[in-house]
Every structure is written in C-alpha cells, then in structure tokens.
Swiss-Prot record:
Organism name: Actinobacillus succinogenes (strain ATCC 55618 / DSM 22257 / CCUG 43843 / 130Z)
InterPro entries registered for this protein in UniProt: Ribosomal_bS20, Ribosomal_bS20_sf
Protein name: Small ribosomal subunit protein bS20
Gene label: rpsT
Pfam families assigned to the protein according to its UniProt record, in alphabetical order: Ribosomal_S20p
Functional description taken from the UniProt entry: Binds directly to 16S ribosomal RNA.
Domain of life according to the entry: Bacteria
Length: 87
C-alpha cells in the first residue's frame, strides 16, 4: 500500500474507476448478448429492437473511451449482418 497521501488518493480513485468501468463493460456485453439471443431464436423484430438499444450503448462506450471505436464498429457490423440474414 502507498505511504504518500497523493498516492493513496490515486489508488482509491483508480479502484473506484476500475469498478465503474467493469460495470459499464458488463452492461454493454449484456446488451450484445440480448441481440445474439434474439438472432439465435430467429426473432427478427426482437433482434432489431435489441440491436437499436445495443447500438446506443456501444456507441456511448466508444465515445467515452471504454472500448475502441473500431471494436464498436465491428460489433455493430457483425450483428447487423446476422439480423439481415434472418428471413
């Protein structure tokens, strides 16, 4: 553990930030899983609705720097392609 006051403060802030980021990342993954589940079930309308929600969340996480912009684009591209395949 740190001895210097500023180092202790940074350690506390870092841990708080780590927990917040983990929560946000988990939430984002949950939205992505909802789209995959709807696609697997073959429900196009449900998949499209879940995709719109997921898209907002993924874009927000990319803009905040939690994930890279290319990773967000990759998620959206793969899932939209799978939704388009549904008849």
């Amino acid at each position: 553990m740190a001895n210097i006051k500023s180092a202790k403060k940074r350690a506390v802030q870092s841990e708080k930030r780590r927990q917040h980021n983990a929560s946000q990342r988990s939430m984002m993954r949950t939205y992505i899983k909802k789209v995959y589940a709807a696609v697997a079930a073959g429900e196009k309308s449900a998949a499209q609705a879940a995709f719109l929600e997921m898209q907002k969340v993924v874009d927000r996480m990319a803009s905040k720097g939690l994930i890279h912009a290319n990773k967000a684009a990759n998620h959206k591209s793969k899932l939209s392609a799978q939704i388009k395949k549904l008849a």
